[in-house]
Swiss-Prot record:
It comes from Ruegeria sp. (strain TM1040). Signal peptide: none annotated. This is Chromosomal replication initiator protein DnaA. PANTHER family: CHROMOSOMAL REPLICATION INITIATOR PROTEIN DNAA. One of its GO terms (molecular function) is ATP hydrolysis activity. The keyword GTP-binding does not apply.
Amino acid sequence: MTDDTWGLLRKRLLKTVGQNNFTTWIEPLELDQVDGGVATFHVPTNFMGNYVSQNFADLILHEFNKSGEAVQRLAFKVAANSPTRPVQPTMSEAIEEPAPLQTTVVDQLGNQEGNTSVKSPPEDLQAAPLDPRFTFDSFVVGKPNELAHAAARRVAEGGPVTFNPLVLYGGVGLGKTHLMHAIAWELKERNPELNVLYLSAEQFMYRFVQALRERKMMDFKHLFRSVDVLMVDDVQFIAGKDSTQEEFFHTFNALVDQNKQIIISADRAPGEIKDLEDRVKSRLQCGLVVDLHPTDYELRLGILQTKVQQNRKNYPDLKIADGVLELLAHRISTNVRVLEGALTRLFAFASLVGREIDMDLTQDCLADVLRASERKITVEEIQRKVSEYYNIRMSDIIGPKRLRSYARPRQVAMYLCKQLTSRSLPEIGRRFGGRDHTTVMHGVRRIEELKTIDGQIAEDVEMLRRSLEA
């Protein structure tokens, strides 16, 4: 096998595993030789060889065979001056009597009981681990996520299946994975015998590819169709992967026909996932589809207050000055993970230097985070987006006309300017045809009132906010 052939394989692997995984795990591999059906690689460490063997061997073998290379297993050895100790190879030969597979939540959490008699592919299915921090008790509920939280609670009660599937979608760091883990924990607590399988869509694809290669599709089908609850995270990963979507579709149908619960998460609504087959979209949309909206100020502040109480266990003597949490909730608005990470950094830094967490320390410690989180949305951008959304001219928003069809979008634009920019009310008024600050204040308050009683206005504002912050 030539280096050029391995180079082509690497390019295909890059497309499959993504840039981060490729850079970390595939790029360091140095092909030594292909001989007797064994592809041998040099790796920097035994750990890397073992990790690649467990997580990427299926894909690498698949690509070898697609290229016409009769590779049946991979071997890894550490490049060193001393004699190298080969890493345990990954076998591709079919095993006649594979070991039983543990598929319940109890097994995934490290408990040794509950083995099923389901036969598996040669390697046990590595279900995604559950984070013990992600429970319903630790989930902070606010208006942006209250519906998703209520739906997750209902499913976790484990009674009759009322909506199937439950699809949770939203941007990064809004709580999808937290709710997925919380559901699994609650189901486990209520019924330890329940057969719950939680995994990522990426893991589903890897197991599918392995089953195809080893001609173990019946085992694969039996495994996934014998669960009581199937939970698949980040379903958008299978978009564009036709064979995987085909099997996912049939698995989905089989479980629904058995009245088994399915819970899915995605980074956007099913109908908006590019390259996802229409029939899969249709299936996902036939249950309850719930959006986790971007956090508002009150929810972010509540999350910070909860995290402070949790951090008190490790930092009982630290003090936080008034206004610090409010500053963070106001300035870090797009990603809860960044928000929580900022607070963790603050606690660690203050503890190391022995200082109170005040405004000065916050500005010094989090200068990069606060700078990156500064709002860069302009008044003009908001005016343009709002006029496009309501299909009116930008001059009508700025102009003097007081028709309802112009006045309401104008008030929405003023409200968004107040929320998403640092402009003062008089400055905003000047950008809206020279209006004074009292007019802007009235418009802002009017939209705040309407959001609570008019679902359409609330949806309009949220859609525009997400569009502007994207």
